[in-house]
Amino acid sequence: MKTLAVFIVVLLYSVTLSSQERITLLFVGDLMQHQAQIDAAHVSEGKYDYSSCFSLIKEQISQADLAIGNLEVTLGGRPYRGYPMFSAPDEYLQAIKDAGFDILLTANNHCLDRGKKGMERTIQLLDSSGIRYAGTYKNLSERRQRYPLFINRNGFRIALLNYTYGTNGIKATSPNIVNYIDKNTILQDIQSAKARQPDAIIACMHWGEEYQSLPNREQRELANWLLQQGVTHIIGSHPHVIQPMELRTNGTEQHIIVYSLGNFISNMSKANTDGGLIFTLQLEKH
């Protein structure tokens, strides 16, 4: 199988919360499947193999306490297709799990590419795989039970939030729910997270403009607002290119904003889309 993984740039930030306890979170950008990738993974009738896509970085992913990526495809079943209406083979999810990913973000502009059936099938496969997720839900009851997504590991409690700017004009079919960027909803979710006294609230935002190497005004304003409401760190996706990062300090507090991690697995050919970041966030307690 021909490997179509992107070039990876590795960055490490250590953010001190207060060193008796420590947790390492690893974030990657867009996990995509264009048609050339699907074709390259095809090994026999009805069978696909993606293991080589992650072979060079599997060890690094697995070393993190938590590895998180943006699943920017549906697992909507056959026929498998790339852009513009993504539906990846089920084997792709298994390869993602085998690579060491623990959590996938599902609120993005392609999560409804296969409509209600595709979104629900994606959720079903995530549930059966044991990979946790945030961003899309079969109904309101499931969202209330599962969101915000709380992670309890190494003595830490972390709340994970995920929202998207839109879904390419396709609307979620009731009772399905997609987390759209809406300040009223986000504020309620932040307050719900705060009530459980997490050590950190991390907002993963699918935002910005595609192929732009700088964040736009809306991204910057929303980032400021999120921090003001109590979000600790912000991780961005969607532009398919790397955008700047910021480390902000407020007294003894430190806040990371990653405006865009770029692509992680893709077959894009536009300028600057062939690079992405592995972002490692280390939190410590004294």
Predicted regions and their residues:
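N-terminal signal peptide c-region/cleavage motif recognized by signal peptidases
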Residues: 14-16
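Acidic, metal/ion-coordinating pockets
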Residues: 19-286
